[in-house]
């Protein structure tokens, strides 16, 4: 529904059902499914396909999520839209491959080195899995940003009857494309909202992109502190500009309560009912 047309992944419990499902579904809608040799390669393939213009997805669990961190950092620095699903399991290391946990929340936020923001969405129901998947792709394309869907083994295996909206009613956001000429275009020159526009690959636009600190033209400037400060400030600011679109929560109970419990994913399933008035 969100327009995903490329998946690269490596089977890992308890996220393998996503890989299996995409292997069946994507060819039916003209998409591409790739089973890669490992988690690092699958992250790199998703980044590359997104750079070429596709809406991309990859899925994994704890050990694979660790291996994808460098790629997530690259996507953040190069401002490449990509959705990463982490179906959490118990850890550390190989951990408990078939049992649930919520142990990856800190890694989801601070798993990469360097100072960059990240968007994390955490569904608690099958309906939210559907809705937040669409939201993840929309935010990734709108803000040019990797987005993590933080699920878990319980939520990932839930079966519920839900009502799906008509496809015509689903809001789908595509990436902004430049209106400037190839001579004027700079791949990292931001618009008013702090987000640069893309240019079509395979067209007259020829430009450079790298994961170093870079100029608006995309060339390395990794010894220039002024360029680095300006770039990092913009990477943070563009998310702040869309804070209202990113942030979402549900409140249960009385607003004059003395105790506030914050929950997400599987834990929300267990505490939402007891906290109702």
Predicted region positions:
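Short, solvent-exposed amphipathic alpha-helical segments in soluble enzyme
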Residues: 23-25, 73-76, 100, 134-139, ...
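Short, small-residue-biased leader/transition segments that mark boundaries at the very start
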Residues: 273-277
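Flexible, low-complexity linker and terminal segments
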Residues: 141-272
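Thiamine diphosphate
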Residues: 1-110, 117
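Short, well-ordered, mixed-charge alpha-helical segments that flank or form enzyme active sites
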Residues: 67, 91-94, 128-130, 156-160
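Gly-rich Lys/Arg/Thr-decorated short loops/hinges at beta-loop-alpha junctions or inter-strand turns
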Residues: 2-3, 23-29, 85-87, 111-117, ...
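Conserved thiamine diphosphate
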Residues: 99-153, 176-180
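Short, glycine-/Ser/Thr-/acidic-enriched flexible segments
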Residues: 13, 63-64, 89-90, 125-127, ...
């Amino acid at each position: 529904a969100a327009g995903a047309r490329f998946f690269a992944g490596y089977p890992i419990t308890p996220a393998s059902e996503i890989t299996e499902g995409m292997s069946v579904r994507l060819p039916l809608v003209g998409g591409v499914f790739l089973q890669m040799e490992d988690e690092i390669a699958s992250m790199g393939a998703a980044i590359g396909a997104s750079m070429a213009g596709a809406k991309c997805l990859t899925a994994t669990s704890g050990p694979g999520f660790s291996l994808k961190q460098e790629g997530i950092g690259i996507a953040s620095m190069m401002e490449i839209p990509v959705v990463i699903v982490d179906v959490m399991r118990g850890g550390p290391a190989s951990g408990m491959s078939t049992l649930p946990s919520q142990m990856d929340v800190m890694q989801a936020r601070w798993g990469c080195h360097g100072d960059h923001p990240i968007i994390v969405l955490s569904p608690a129901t099958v309906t939210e899995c559907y809705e937040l998947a669409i939201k993840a792709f929309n935010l990734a394309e709108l803000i040019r940003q990797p987005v993590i869907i933080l699920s878990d083994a319980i939520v990932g295996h839930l079966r519920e009857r839900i009502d799906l909206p008509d496809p015509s009613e689903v809001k789908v956001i595509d990436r902004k494309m430049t209106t400037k000429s190839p001579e004027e275009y700079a791949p990292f020159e931001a618009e008013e909202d702090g987000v640069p526009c893309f240019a079509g690959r395979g067209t007259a636009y020829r430009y450079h992109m790298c994961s170093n600190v870079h100029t608006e033209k995309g060339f390395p400037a990794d010894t220039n502190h002024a360029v680095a400060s300006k770039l990092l400030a913009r990477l943070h600011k563009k998310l702040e500009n869309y804070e209202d679109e990113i942030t979402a929560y549900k409140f249960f109970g009385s607003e004059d309560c003395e105790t506030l419990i914050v929950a997400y994913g599987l834990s929300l399933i267990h505490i939402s009912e007891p906290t109702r008035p």
